[in-house]
UniProtKB/Swiss-Prot annotation:
Main location, first listed in the record: cytoplasm
Gene: TEKT3
Free-text tissue specificity from the UniProt record: Expressed in spermatozoa where it localizes to the sperm head (at protein level). Detected at lower levels in the sperm flagellum (at protein level). Expressed in trachea multiciliated cells.
Protein source organism: Bos taurus
Membrane topology recorded in Swiss-Prot or TrEMBL: Peripheral membrane protein
Name listed for the protein in its UniProt record: Tektin-3
Oligomer status and interactors: Microtubule inner protein component of sperm flagellar doublet microtubules. Interacts with TEKT1, TEKT2, TEKT4 and TEKT5. Interacts with CCDC38.
Length: 490
């Protein structure tokens, strides 16, 4: 019989009473029969906390109750308390058959329970052994996998370290040759300045010497050559800067990957050496459901392999760039030196030509001065001769004038008269001739003076040109950088 809504006065709420002789002692039954019904905690009603809300099952048959009752005994079903204490003592709930069947059922259930328990113990022991072996094998497999993982990480870590060392060495070498390139580029400024100053000084040449000669052509070629070399150096300098940036980027990726590998190596190596008795072993509930992985072994290996391949590619490009920079340093140094020698040779030839022209001008000037002196002496001689001839003319003319005073018939055209007339004409013609020769000599002297001035000016021009080319330009060109400095070595 199942009773609901029992109060705290129920018999099951108090200690178990002492067994009577009506039923066999409980101690005579099997231990498995004792307390075969599980104990239930009584939960209280939410509306009536003093009333339990559970129930229990006493028997499978419902007893027959007295159908007759008085009005005062009629109560609602919700407040009725069908307990033993409220029933009549003449009412019995079970029959002896029920009692024997209950015992038999309990005995059978006891045997079944013991058999099931024994089988459960055997199966459980076997299960424990199987699971223990399986767990140990699983842990061994995990340990082996961790060991293999540690070996893989160690392999890739060594590969990264090897490539990182090579990349660092290559970057250092590229940095060194970049510095050499920068020094070589700085060394080209002095020759360029010298060439430009030579052109500037040669603009101060005078007169006819301000000529577009071979020296000027070679100087302009030298300026163009140095500028072209500077452009190539600057181009390779920009390439070196960009390549250094690429090398450092690849190096950064390798260093980052190496740092991750080292951290992973420490973690996995620690996990690989963890045992059941190790310190720090604890429960982390739900950790197996957290999947924070971002790669698989294939993508993991490919990531590092790509980093190494990228670094190797950048190293190859860096090595090729270093060779190109070395070649351009040698080529530009040779080009500038060859052009420097050409300019110097042109200067030497031009200086020799100018010196020879100057010497010739000096020779002509000396001859001109000598000729001027001779011409001046000639002019003085002509003037003296004219003065001397003037006296003869005056004497002849005076004679003729005096003879005009002869009286009458004495004015005879005699030989003396004729001779005096001829003498006057002859002396006058001589004087005219001498005067013409004097004018010619004076013109010649003026021409010689002009030639002298021209030669002196030309001599000054040549001296100025020689001073510019020999003293100014060639003195500056003695400080041209050496080949070692032009290729970037100190």
């Amino acid at each position: 019989m199942e009773l609901l809504g029992s109060t705290l006065t129920a018999t099951y709420a108090h200690p178990r009473p002492t067994p009577t002789n009506f039923l066999p002692a409980i101690s005579t039954m099997a231990s498995t029969y004792r307390d075969r019904f599980p104990h239930y905690n009584l939960t209280h009603s939410l509306s009536l906390p003093w009333r339990p809300s559970t129930y229990y099952k006493a028997a499978s048959n419902w007893p027959t109750l007295d159908p007759y009752c008085t009005r005062s005994q009629r109560v609602s079903e919700s407040t009725m308390l069908p307990f033993v204490s409220n029933r009549t003592t003449l009412f019995t709930r079970y029959t002896p058959d029920d009692w024997y069947r209950s015992n038999l059922t309990n005995f059978q259930e006891s045997n079944t329970s013991r058999h099931n328990s024994e089988r459960l113990r055997v199966d459980t022991s076997r299960l424990i052994q199987d699971k223990y072996q399986q767990t140990r094998k699983t842990q061994a497999d995990s340990t082996q996998n961790l060991g293999e993982r540690v070996n893989d990480i160690g392999f890739w870590k060594s590969e990264i370290i090897h490539e990182l060392d090579a990349m660092i060495g290559e970057t250092n070498e590229l940095t060194d040759i970049k510095k050499r390139l920068e020094r070589a580029l700085m060394e080209t400024e002095a020759p360029l300045q010298v060439a430009r100053e030579c052109l500037f000084h040669r603009e101060k040449r005078m007169g006819i010497d301000l000529v577009h000669d071979e020296v000027e052509k070679e100087l302009l070629t030298e300026v163009d050559t140095i500028l072209c070399c500077q452009e190539r150096m600057k181009l390779y300098l920009d390439k070196a800067i960009a390549q250094l940036a690429a090398n450092r980027a690849a190096q950064h990726e390798l260093e980052k990957d190496l740092s991750d590998k080292q951290s992973a190596y420490r973690i996995d190596d620690k996990c690989h050496h963890l045992r059941n008795t190790s310190d720090g072993v604890s429960y982390f509930h739900g950790v197996e459901r957290v999947d924070a992985t971002v790669s698989v072994p294939e993508s993991w290996a490919k990531f590092t392999d790509d980093n190494i391949l990228r670094s190797q590619s950048e190293r190859a490009a860096s090595a090729k760039l270093r060779d190109d920079i070395q070649n351009v340093l040698v080529v530009t140094a040779n080009e500038m030196w060859n052009q420097f020698n050409k300019v110097n040779l042109a200067f030497t030839n031009r200086i020799a030509e100018t010196a020879d022209a100057k010497n010739k001008i000096q020779t002509h000037l000396a001859k001109t001065l000598q000729e001027i002196f001779q011409t001046e002496m000639t002019i003085e001689s002509i003037k003296k001769a004219i003065v001397e001839k003037s006296a003869f003319l005056k004497v002849a003319q005076t004679r003729l004038d005096e003879r005009t005073r002869r009286p009458n018939i004495e004015l005879c055209r005699d030989m003396a008269q004729l001779r005096l007339v001829n003498e006057v004409y002859e002396v006058d013609d001589t004087i005219q001739t001498l005067q013409q020769r004097l004018r010619d000599a004076e013109d010649t002297l003026q021409s010689l003076a002009h030639t002298k001035a021209t030669l002196e000016h030309d001599l000054a021009v040549k001296a100025n040109s020689l001073y510019i080319d020999q003293d100014k330009c060639m003195s500056m060109r003695r400080s041209f950088p050496s080949t070692l400095r032009l290729v970037g070595f100190c």
